[in-house]
Amino acid sequence: MESTECVRVAVNIRPLITPELLNGCTDCITVAPKEPQVHIGSHTFTYDFVYGNGGYPCSEIYNHCVAPLVDALFKGYNATVLAYGQTGSGKTYTMGTNYSGDCTNGGVIPNVMEDIFRRVETTKDSSELLIRVSFIEIFKEEVFDLLDSNSSALLKNDSGVQAKHTALSRAPIQIRETASGGITLAGVTEAEVKTKEEMGSFLARGSLSRATGSTNMNSQSSRSHAIFTITLEQKKIAGGSCTTTEDGGEDILCAKLHLVDLAGSERAKRTGADGMRLKEGIHINKGLLALGNVISALGDEKKRKEGGHVPYRDSKLTRLLQDSLGGNSKTVMIACVSPADTNAEETLNTLKYANRARNIQNKAVINRDPATAQMQRMRSQIEQLQTELLFYRGDSGAFDELQILKHKISLLEASNRELHNELQERRVASEHFSKRAYDAQVEKDKLIMIIESVRNGKSLDEIESCQNEDVGLVNKYVSKIQELEGELLHIKNLKKTSNHQYSDDSYDVGPRSNNVLFPSSNESSDCEDKVMDVTDELEFQEKEIEHCSLQEKLDMELKELDKRLEEKEAEMKRFSSGGTSVLKQHYEKKVYDLEQEKRALQREIEGLRHNLASIPSGPGDGAQKLKEEYVQKLNTLETQVSVLKKKQDAQAQLMRQKQKSDDAAIKLQDEIHRIKSQKVQLQQKIKQESEQFRAWKASREKEVMQLKKEGRRNEYEMHKLMALNQKQKLVLQRKTEEASQVTKRLKELLDNRKASSRETLSGANGPGTQALMQAIEHEIEVTVRVHEVRSEYERQTEERARMAKEVARLREENELLKNAKISVHGDTMSPGARNSRIFALENMLATSSSTLVSMASQLSEAEERERVFGGRGRWNQVRTLGDAKSIMNYLFNLASTARCLARDKEADCREKDVLIRDLKEKIVKFSSYVRYMEIQKADLVHQVKAQTSAMKKLSADENLKNEHSMKKQETRNSTIVLEDMDTSDSEASDHEREDPDLDDEWKPEHESERESEQESVIKLNRKRNFKVGRRRSSVVMRRSYEENSETPSDDAVKSDVCCCTCSKSSSCKTMKCQCRATKGSCGPSCGCSSVKCSNRNADGKENNSISESEALENGENSQESDEKDKGQQQQVLASRGAMLLQNALADKPEEETNDDGGTRRRRKPLSDIGNTTGKSNVPRPSQRKKWKKTVLQLVPVGPPALPPTHTNTHLIPEANSVTVDSDTARMPENSDSGESNSIKLKLPRAMRSASSNGSNLLRERNADQNGSESGGNSGFVQSNSGRASGSRTSDEKENHTRRV
């Protein structure tokens, strides 16, 4: 029976594994709900079953896919389960090839073993089963036996790599092809198994011997294709539903189940394979490529109809799977895929191959024993030939009659089955009734014996005591009788069946002779052989008739013996039914009792006679009466003795009759034994005759089989020659067609050459060549595009893995923060920012996943296009030698141009490498120089600190010397204070901007002494200075007396040794300067300022710039130390203040750094902004006391600042320098020596006033009135009560402005 069906395909989607989840992989496969449909990107595939990821659960794979194959295996069909997919997709886990004896892991193979042996237990009564297993692997295109016990044991090291010497010790197995076209393995081990545990042990042993290894994608990757084969042979036992075939031969089925676990396809770049692993991967991919080509060839319906070539011989794997793919097998393919988007390309290729496999059609047939199958085919052929013969004889109604007979036969077979079932039921009922009849017979015999005992006068106690012995004897006789009856019935049935068989054989002579006398048209060429067959057949029939007559004669004798045996057994049964043995015992006991009673009575009579004789004969009445009593009693006893004698005689007569019956029974038993022995001898003779006839018949059948085999061989040769002839005809026809096509093509080419001869003369590049070149350009562009897409695919994969790690890290930080396991540091991201980052990364991951799937789809389509159009398909348009030369020249030009460009790029790269190397060397040098400068800076800072401490001591000595001169100067200045206080606000503002360094000449060490001298003046001018003080309260002074006393003045030292006596505000342009009058230059010992003085050399300016840079460095160092003590709120406030100041001023005022880290604005000389010079001889009032600190909140408003025309980047103030503290407000009085020339700037009056006042208009608004009017008790008190013209001078105003 042949059935055609397609290969069934199931897709198993495994879940994402831990490494894929860590890399941020997502599912790229979606399963349609309640449909076996899979979506990946823009592709949709439909299969028979889909498991995992929304489909059926994976545990249902066996029930849906493999269980029907096990049913087919027991029906005689070959079956195959094939697991296909990329490495790491779960093929070995699905198949269960890594079986270790534990069934909890599941898998196809363990379930198959359990199901097979469960079915074996249910069918062992009707069939004899023989199960064999084999386990092979295909490693490096060589077939090895995993169950070979002769080869050395395979040892594995810790990493799972097989040792080389053990791998070489195994001998490869050769593949052979049978005469019928099947594939066999020469020398493979086929172990016979009888239990599931035994089969599991072979599977586990082979799994341990299988080649495995570790790669980047799978720690235990299968490095070979494994095939576990289960061979099942079954023969029906007599009494089963299908015991024998119609000709009396046994029906033997032999089927195989192949369980294939393929090695996964892999890419060397992703697996990281090298060396031996790389070679193994090459062989694996080679075998899978051949398998894919076979699937493509079998799945293409057009090629299948045309009878195209299927490349089975390209690989040993495809040769072994030749029957499974397109052959005699029922096949299920399980495509194992990974849902990770990084594996989207391999997953798409696997799904495409699985979709093609659904189009493969297999033709599975029942695999019977060759001899039985041949007899079945011959019988079918005979029936067909008989039907055709009847049809060709002209009897058209015979065919219809045959169909009617076939229908009747089917009905009779159905009726036969029903009757057979009814017979089974009746047989069960008959056994039940026979058992009941047996019990009834035993009970009946028991009752008969009890009745006889009662009739014989036995008491109930005696009957019950003897009942057990009687029951055993009765059961023994009844069972013996039933056995004899069963044997007799069996002999009768055998006799009847033998008679029917002989009669059937005699009836079969006619049809056989008819079949011989009317050979079919197909055998007309072998008439002479058929005549010999007819004579042999007639001789065989005569011999068989003779044997049948002899058998009938022996059967008649056996029937007579059975009849006599029945009669004797019936008579024996009558004897046994009487219970003679029981009666004998009963009567013997009765006789013995009577004899005992007789002797007792005789003794009593003798005693009575003796007593009677001893009685005296006197006349007494007593003696007479006693004598009469004795006489009467004596008579009674004598009467009893006579009765007993009669009974004894009767019993003796019965005993004699019983002895006669016993002798008759013994004689009857002897006759029965003699008849049985004759029967046995006759049966042995019948059996011997049957054996002789069977041996003769077997020899004749063997000769017939040999002749038929030779006839089949001749017929096969004839068919082979006919097929060869037909094939040659087809080849000849194809060659003729090809020749005609080539001739036609040649004519077309000649016509094209004649038509294009003029074009080739005008130029080599014709339209056809241009089209070819464009096609080549297109192919190259496609290749480059594929390379770009693959590179981008790999880059996206790496980038996605990095983002996944970052998301995992951020989530872990969230969890730790929630659990309060870590503390929040300054550099830790806020929770909102972290959540936003996670959300953004997740969106990027989703976008990356869709991009990866799209690129994988493009790469898969490119590979498919390369497979279809690559090779010869790419050059189909090249039809002439000229086109080939043009294409080769064009390709040569492309290759040479690409090579030249590559060389140019290499040269550019080398130049860039040299440049990068030089830059790296410079970076190293500058880094070392920076470290050297930092060391020098630290040394200079240390020196400056030492010099500062020395200058403090020197300034203290100088202050003591100049105390007397300062008192006189203060007295002169106090007389002029009232005059200067009458000036207007604008004049005060101008005086404040006139000379920023006038207050530097004041010595803070003497302020405590000057306070007492100027008390009277301050009291007089308190009212007049109130308005001026309130207006100037915005300029916050936070400089303490103690801090001012620590800052020495370098100009004080210079004034003692000055050449000229010019003031610091003087520019030394007139002849009043002694240095200019003597035609000399001012020097560092002069009293004039280095910034204002125009009579100084460039060297001095350079020295001043050097000193200024040193001061800046010192200020930066101190500023860095101060910044560490300031809080976060001051930094924010300072940054906003800096923004406000930059928006308020067109040009940013230059600032200068003090030694202690404070900053102050550099003031421009009044001569540069158009104001008149203030009076140089104006007395300087005493400084204010320490001002109270106030908080200033600056709001950045106003238009954006204009870019400054010139700004020194190293003088830009820090953001935290706007809020001035008392610690940072100290300014050395010699800071004028480090100032550079200011840039001329014309500003409006209001802006000049704001800038000169330190831009503290907002502070003036928010300042505390009480804080601005008075300071601390230890500081110098400056009155703000009014505008007294004599209380404050322009120098004082300027000093206050500078300190802000």
From Swiss-Prot:
Entry keyword set: ATP-binding, Cell wall biogenesis/degradation, Coiled coil, Microtubule, Motor protein, Nucleotide-binding
GO molecular function annotation: ATP binding; microtubule binding; microtubule motor activity
Coiled-coil spans in chain: 580-615, 653-697, 781-823
CDD domains: KISc_KIF4 (cd01372)
Signal sequence interval, chain numbering: none
Protein residues bound to ATP: G85, Q86, T87, G88, S89, G90, K91, T92
GO cellular component labels: microtubule; plasmodesma
Protein name: Kinesin-like protein KIN-4C
